[in-house]
Amino acid sequence: MQAKSLSSRSRLVGASLACAVFTAALIYIPARSHVAAQQARAPRPASPFTQPDPIDFNDHDGWTQIFDGKTLNGWDGTPDVWHVEDGAIVGVSTTQHPSGTTNIIWRGGEPANFKLKVEMKLEGAGANGGIQYRSLNVPPRPRVIPPERLAQMTDEQKQRMKQGEALAQKYAKWNIQGYQADFDYNNTYTGQLYEQGTPRGIVAWRGQMVETEAGKPHRLLATLGSSDDLKAFIKPGEWNQYEVIADGNTLVHIINGHVMSILIDTDPKYAQSKGLIAFEIEGGGDLKISHRNVWLKKLP
């Protein structure tokens, strides 16, 4: 009888405890939900944010001037084409004395990761130039024209081609192969990333962010804007601020503060981790290409 009484008493105590726990839960859960709701509604503390200051193209803190504005000391190019004029490195080509495609090379080293900025101006409708970087000083490649293309060429075109080949041999000492930040008077190609002297040719058009990998077609990662919209920021016949950033496999071209093209180059067959800096001149007719305020900033 005593055992039965204890059993009943235990059941009573257990039921009381269960009721107490259930009641506490009913009270606690809404309270916790109320606190969570208050926390969700409570505004987060405002994070301080300051707009980044625009970079001043003329701020040279941490940069090295690689053209003194007076002489071609440290630069190597044919005097037939290149000289200093009004504080600028100037390349000239005329109908009577064409330059062909040739370069003036900075002999101060082979930078790997860096920023390079220069002001450029092109004069003459046929003017075509660019900034070579991470480039190689190699003999010119023989130009091979398919027979069917050769058969379609006029005598004038054949003569120009023959003249170009002769000039390439004459100025072979300054032949360059590698990445080029392109610049032409008509701004058809200005801002694009062109690879001079290799089968790749144009790698990233103006307005494109492109990635290359071994054995795969080039991939368009993003568009930076339409080619025509970006072209509107380029000033024909005037000074333009051109900046090249080479950091690891990432290459960026900027003109007058606007990103023109980006390449992420991971193709080991073509990617160059360091090399020469040079300015190119080419084109037909009377033309002039000027470069001033040339500054280099090496990156880690």
Residue ranges and their predicted role:
Residues 1-9:
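N-terminal secretory signal peptides that target proteins for export/translocation
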Residues 11-14:
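Short, hydrophobic alpha-helical membrane anchors of single-pass surface/secreted proteins
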Residues 16-28:
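Bacterial N-terminal signal peptides
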Residues 27-35:
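Hydrophobic single-pass membrane-insertion segments
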Residues 34-300:
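Carbohydrate-interacting regions of secretory-pathway proteins
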